[in-house]
Swiss-Prot record:
This is UPF0371 protein CLJ_B0384. HAMAP family: UPF0371. It comes from Clostridium botulinum (strain 657 / Type Ba4). Belongs to the UPF0371 family. Signal peptide: none annotated.
Amino acid sequence: MRIGFDHEKYLEEQSKYILERVNNYDKLYLEFGGKLLFDLHAKRVLPGFDENAKIKLLHKLKEKVEIIICLYAGDIERNKIRGDFGITYDVDVLRLIDDLRGYDLEVNSVVITRYSGQPATNIFINKLERRGIKVYKHEATKGYPTDVDTIVSDEGYGKNPYIETTKPIVVVTAPGPGSGKLATCLSQLYHEYKRGNVAGYSKFETFPVWNVPLKHPLNIAYESATVDLKDVNMIDSFHFDAYNKVAVNYNRDIESFPVLKRIIEKITGEESVYKSPTDMGVNRVGFGIVDDEVVKEASKQEIIRRAFKTACEYKKGYVDKETFHRAKLIMEEMNLKEEDRKVVIPAREYAAKLKERANKSETCTVVALELEDGTILTGRSSELMDGTAAVILNAVKHYANISDEIHLISPVILEPIINLKAKTLGSKRTALSCEEVLIALSICAATNPTAQVAMGRLPMLKGCQAHSTTILSTNEEQTFRKLGIDVTCDPEYISESLYYNN
């Protein structure tokens, strides 16, 4: 893989800049946008970026940092899903707490925002409290977003309970956008000043990258990733007016800046040190780019990937038609097409060939996989196994120089598994999934040296690209994710079944 980003340089620059910012205050509330862990988007568009860079940064500052996690009550009620992991936001909070503790980071509490006694939210609160985790409930702020006098009063932020913190940097994070991070930071700022403490607010958001051109593919890829939020990158006019320098930000931050500035000035009783939304940020990711061409190409591929993802989400009913069309439009505006993703054409051509040979109405899933050396392999679904499993077996055979004719998994192992699924468990779909095939392969590896060699090649699939001609089940997507394979799908179901497709 060609590297476009210097991870070590970025970590050094970023930690230094955060510490410089905290020196101005007794306490700094740092709003962390994007993903704190497993930032797969950043990893894809910035080759060389560590997906856990942010948490490693916090680990470096662990003596000075504690963490508050925000979760919007409405997201619990509607079971909002974190797309890259296929888990709900409330479950992601539990995962996040475990992961933060694994990095020796102190989790202060969980804040439920815009709380109004929702039943599912109460169950989640009970679950946390009974495991010894502090939970604070913040209701919707009266007067927000325009009535600053009410917002900054005992009727507004004053109604929220004060969260007791002890360290100079308080990181406020969440599973996703719209979780109430900013409101929590400002509420805390209000309470700090009421107590006579000098506190500050800053924002750490990786994208858009403020010191990269507006129409750079890296920033356009961010628009594509947030197409459901309708985010649009813009030139920060406040920054240009104050410093005569061009900086990129996004519409929500620019639109809310005048009110945000007034709220901060009302809380502190003095003029804000921030002249623009860009001033509020502490992001230094742009300084880690070492090969712009590599980043551009990776970002273009991400735009195509996002268009596929949005098309599938539209088919599943998760997003509206406007979001679907916008993702496609962003791709077309960059003069990109679906076929610019190398694995798309081989998958579609093989699927078309199979359809010609078989019943015209039958749909067969074909998965194409591009290896690091540029080789493209395919696998098809059959009565025995899914297309995902077939292509993985083909890939490990390729890496281990094992002939196609050699069976890696003994029928003695496969038949009892299929019988178990069909007869004992009564499953309608008896074809083995990718995960089931990998488990079967690992059993065979105990007695078959060839299978053992093939198993040893699985880590080589990390970073590979794949495309499926039909929508994959959540389970198949997660298996590919665990293997480190980026997969896209055509927005077609394998059958007309409504339930058994998944």
